[in-house]
A protein has these predicted regions:
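Membrane-entry segments of alpha-helical transmembrane domains in multi-pass membrane proteins
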Residues: 123-136, 161-171
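Primarily the internal scaffold of c-type cytochrome electron-transfer domains
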Residues: 24-118, 153-174, 179, 184-296, ...
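Sec-dependent N-terminal signal peptides
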Residues: 6-13
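C-terminal motif of bacterial Sec signal peptides marking the signal peptidase cleavage site
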Residues: 16-19
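Glycine-rich active-site/cofactor-binding loop and its immediate structural neighborhood
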Residues: 143, 152
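Positively charged n-region of N-terminal signal peptides that target proteins for export
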Residues: 1-4
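Long, composition-driven intrinsically disordered regions
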Residues: 103, 108-129, 136, 146
Length: 429
């Protein structure tokens, strides 16, 4: 049920903004913000503009002006048209209806009230402002708009402490060219510096066409003191679910491990995982991470009426890209669509099963707290195990590919979530 339309969302929400499918042709994703030069008027969307494959990081400082997608339309008309085609993805699903355990599992945070599916990059500002959930700080705009990305690059951590409304007044468009290209037009640039900070020297070990997507399709948290968007690792080796959980458990805030929220009935200090597509795809067990970038699968090469080739910026599932399926995927897969759907069905089955187990654990722990029959030490022991169980489940639930990006990692996370939930159940009197 969750995302019966997942094959589209896997592309629209999961992994996007990248470079080329054919690494020798046409423009792709981000680049460092230079002073905005007026874009050229001719549609120079040819191989001469192929970006270098070395990771670039945005130059921060004052005087940053964002060039909008429309500003680039004259130079890249076909790419611009393909970008606007993302507007067709209008449907929103409320996950709290599709997954009835969510209001219990997420109790204590806004997602328990409404959890809408993402509609893609052209709707990010509209979606974050119309959730019905209160937003205090501007950091909610991280990865929602190039305007806020530029604010952070110009102001530093001070931008994270702006109010939501003050930032909104300065926002003009949803995710667009600057997020992945800065103001360069066709080069790939890491414009979200927290990714570069977290990757360290490993930044150069990942293709820029994957880094472009990995800027936003990641697990992150807001640092308690600065409210800055922060990734919970230091390199590729510490980007695993186990290491990330350990990071959070070792990050002490007011004498207790970091938490995104606390369940009001159980007292469990919960971690709310975001959308760890980057960590999942780059993780152990990933079959394609060393061969294909995010863009290779989700941004196909297209041909304009005049014969010009360009990279489509309509983010789709690779299963919807007939040329990719026939010319590339078929070399190894005889029935990739059937294989992917089988993986997704099994992942969904287990996600529901473990989710209901966590719902039952939450209710049982709430009763234990209310009963007064347990010492605080006993309750804290159960809470610690329940916290870890939910983390592993959430890592899969919110990743958006239903196991397609890395079924081995997702299966391992669900195994751990199930084992920990059962362990916690066994701790009751």
């Amino acid at each position: 049920m969750k995302k019966a339309w997942i094959l589209l969302l896997t592309a629209l929400m999961a992994l996007s903004f990248c470079a080329c499918q054919s690494k020798t042709e046409t423009p792709a994703a981000p680049a460092a913000p230079a002073a905005p030069a007026a874009p050229a008027t001719e549609a120079a969307q040819t191989a001469e503009e192929t970006p270098a494959r070395k990771a670039q990081v945005v130059q921060t400082g004052s005087g940053i002006t964002v060039m909008t997608a429309e500003d680039w339309a004259g130079k890249y008309p076909e790419i611009y048209k393909s970008y606007l085609a993302n507007n067709d993805n209008k449907e929103v699903h409320d996950y709290t209806k599709d997954y009835p355990m969510i209001p219990i599992i997420y109790e204590g945070m806004a997602f328990s009230k409404f959890y809408g599916s993402a509609r893609g990059h052209t709707y990010t500002v509209e979606d974050v402002t119309s959730t019905g959930r209160p937003h205090k700080l501007a950091n909610c705009f991280t990865c929602k708009t190039p305007d806020y990305t530029a604010m952070v690059n110009e102001m530093g951590d001070a931008a994270y402490q702006m109010t939501f409304e003050d930032a909104l007044a300065q926002i003009n468009e949803s995710i667009s060219c600057y997020n992945c290209h800065a103001n360069t037009g066709n080069e790939l640039v890491v414009t979200h510096t927290y990714l570069a900070d977290a990757m360290g020297d490993d930044l150069q070990n990942v293709d820029p066409a994957t880094l472009a997507c990995g800027q936003c399709h990641v697990e992150y948290y807001f640092a308690p003191q600065t409210k800055a968007t922060t990734l919970p690792y230091q390199n590729l080796a510490t980007m695993t679910p186990d290491a990330i959980l350990d990071y959070y458990n070792r990050t002490i805030v007011d004498g207790q491990p970091f938490a995104d929220y606390t369940n009001p009935r159980t007292g469990v200090r919960q971690i709310k995982v975001q959308h760890p597509e980057f960590e999942t795809y780059m993780g152990a067990g990933s079959v394609h991470k060393d061969t294909f970038t995010c863009a290779d699968c989700h941004m196909g090469e297209a041909t304009a009426a005049d014969g010009t080739t360009y990279i489509s910026h309509t983010w789709i599932s690779p299963l919807e890209n007939k040329a990719l399926m026939e010319n590339t995927c078929s070399q190894c897969h005889t029935d990739l669509t059937g294989q992917v759907r089988a993986i997704q069905q099994e992942t969904e089955r287990r996600t529901y099963a473990v989710g209901y187990l966590l719902e039952g654990l939450t209710e049982k722990l709430a009763l234990a707290v209310e009963s007064g029959e347990y010492t605080e030490e006993e309750l804290n022991g159960i809470r610690a195990v329940a916290r870890d169980a939910q983390f592993y489940w959430d890592f899969v639930f919110v990743e958006n590919s239903e196991g397609a990006h890395n079924s081995a990692l997702d299966s391992d996370c669900l195994d751990k979530a199930e084992a920990l939930a059962n362990q916690a159940m066994g701790m009751f009197k």
